[in-house]
């Protein structure tokens, strides 16, 4: 996911001219990519039991910035949709 979101050398995202981050101006990639990477936030939603089982591995990935819990999908994956008072949700 990080490689898809970030520009070289941190990722593989293709750059194009006129991005809002650069006020729609064209810049050489050597200048633009570091600025674009700094402005790109990688958010990995934790919405499945399998994701929680691997949360430490996912958190260790260089470039992952935020990992919020998607309680709607998670409670559905636990077959308790919308039961936010379940002890597993609080944990």
Where would I find each of the regions flagged by the language model?
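Expand to "…catalyze enediolate/carbanion chemistry for C-C bond making/breaking, isomerization
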Residues: 2-91
């Amino acid at each position: 996911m990080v490689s898809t979101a970030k520009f070289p050398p941190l990722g593989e995202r293709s750059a194009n001219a006129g991005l809002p981050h650069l006020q729609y101006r064209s810049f050489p990639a050597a200048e633009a990519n570091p600025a674009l990477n700094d402005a790109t936030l990688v958010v990995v939603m934790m919405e499945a039991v399998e994701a929680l089982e691997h949360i430490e591995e996912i958190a260790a990935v260089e470039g992952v910035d935020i990992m919020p819990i998607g309680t709607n999908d998670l409670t559905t994956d636990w077959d308790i949709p919308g039961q936010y008072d379940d002890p597993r949700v609080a944990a």
